Structures are given as C-alpha cells and as structure tokens.
C-alpha cells in the first residue's frame, strides 16, 4: 500500500525515516497535485526538522526526474553539470556560470541546470539573460545547443512543469526545504558527472551518496569553509568525491593548486549588471581573484568530466582557454545560438 500523506507526516513528527519506495509514492502524489497545500507544507517542515535522509532525497529526486521534460542526448561522454544548491548568501558574481564557458572551451560538454537567483545577486538564468542569451529553450533546442556549442542551459521552470504545484507553498513558507537540494540532482539531460556546490557541510557527504544511489558516474560535491557553495579561495573546501562507485571525503585549499587565497568579499556584486561585468572580465582573462576562482572551479569540472586527469591538470587547461580567447568565443557562440534558435522558432 502506498504511504498516505498523514502517515508520512506522522513519521517526520516521530523523527522516523520515510523509506525510499515510500518517498517515491509520496512525491508522486505531491507532484500530481493530490496533496493539499497545508499537508505539503507540514511534510516539508517535518522533513527539514528531522533532517532528510539519503533514501528520502534519492526517492524524491527519482520522482522529479520522472516528471521532468527530458533533453535527449545520445553521447554523454565528458558531459558535466556545474551547479549549486544556492542559499549560501555570498552575493558573489556567477562563478559556476562563468566556469561553464571555460569548461566547455576546455573540452567538456556542459549541461547546466539552473534557475533565477537564490544566493547570488543574480542566478545563472539572470546572468545568461544579462549576457544576451535566451534561456527558455525547449528540450530539443537544448540538445542542439549542446551538440553545436558544447553548452546546454536548462531553465528549471521549462523542464519541471510539475513544480508549479508546490511553488505557492514554497514561496509562502520562505524557508529551505528538500526541494532546495533536489534541483541539482534532477538534471534533465541526465548528465552522468556533476560538480555540485552545497550550502551546508553536512550535505557534502549526503549529496555525494545520493548521487551514488542515483547512479551517477562521477561527482564532486563541495562546500567552502567560508560558506561558499563553490571551491573557495577564502578558505579550505570540503569535498565529497564519487569515483569508481565509491565516495571519498577530503579537503582542498587554493594553495594546493598554486592559487593565492582571497576573501569572498572580493567577488561580491550588487546586481546582475555588476555580475555580468565581472564575468566578462574573467572571460577576457583579466588577472585577479575572480579569474582564479573560475579557473579553480572550471578545472574541477574538467576533472569530474574526465577531460583532465586531476583538478590541477584541469586548472592548467582552464587557464589555457582563458588566455587564448577560447572561453570568450564559447560564450559568444552560445549566445548567438540561443538567439538564432528562438528567432527560427
């Protein structure tokens, strides 16, 4: 028998787990709009208070994937998603979005799943729009973009229409729920590799093991000790690495890669326009902390995508494509593709 919403709520009140298959049943009911807003908010609160388990997160992610509009990709070699849970409150420029162009220029296929602002002054969708890109591409257009430019940006509302059911509840609650950690787990292109930033140290090991359960090939889940949901320049970064079916947890520091430490305040921006300006400076290879943090994160993406043999090798490759203009050319090609694709309908 499927678990009822009332039974699920009772479990959370008693700090007991909703098992994987039960979570699948429950999430299907929620995504179909069969559970009242009051009950959804109660369950989300209960899960948050008792802390979501690996099985609960994996079960919920399985259903979100099931309900998504997929991007059909035949060749997933060297494919990677560079994504963060957001919510770190750092208000930095769009580091992962900038790293996307560098990683693509370096030989990865970047299938980035994103949305509007959560923790930065502008989310990945906001940043791409500020750069002139059209973000609301249909799944077949994203697949074509990936094939032609090495980049496919999947705007979450286009690919997860069922999320409209819970949007009003999430908006009214105004606090983090399980849905904040599900987004990065539900890439519509099925990227087998992922560089994921998280907003809390506990999530490093949890999300790496959720990805393991969901069948990911390789992953780096990262949290900077200064609170950033990226590999950080301002402090050490906790890493949960999934490779060869095993999860290993360790810590890295910018000095390990010959990069000078720099406080995250040097990366802060006030709005999307400032974020755009800093991103373009990086892609134009202007030296400074912004360039360094993008090279670090793009290098990690190239490593997890299997293009580079190590993060250090990935950083070398990232700096090469920044210096020779390939990363900037990748941005220009992507923006042009999105504009042409939508103009053609």
UniProtKB/Swiss-Prot annotation:
5-phospho-alpha-D-ribose 1-diphosphate binds at residues 84, 87-88, 92, 94-97, 112-120, 124. GO terms for cellular component: cytosol. Pfam families: Glycos_trans_3N, Glycos_transf_3. Coiled coil: none annotated. Mg(2+) 2 binds at residues 229-230. InterPro entries: Anthranilate_Pribosyl_Tfrase, Glycosyl_Trfase_fam3, Glycosyl_Trfase_fam3_N_dom, Glycosyl_Trfase_fam3_N_dom_sf, Nuc_phospho_transferase. One of its GO terms (biological process) is L-tryptophan biosynthetic process. Its EC number is 2.4.2.18. Anthranilate 1 binds at residues 84, 115. Its cofactor is Mg(2+). It catalyses: N-(5-phospho-beta-D-ribosyl)anthranilate + diphosphate = 5-phospho-alpha-D-ribose 1-diphosphate + anthranilate. One of its GO terms (molecular function) is magnesium ion binding. Anthranilate 2 binds at residue 170. NCBIfam families: trpD. This is Anthranilate phosphoribosyltransferase. It comes from Xanthomonas campestris pv. campestris (strain ATCC 33913 / DSM 3586 / NCPPB 528 / LMG 568 / P 25).
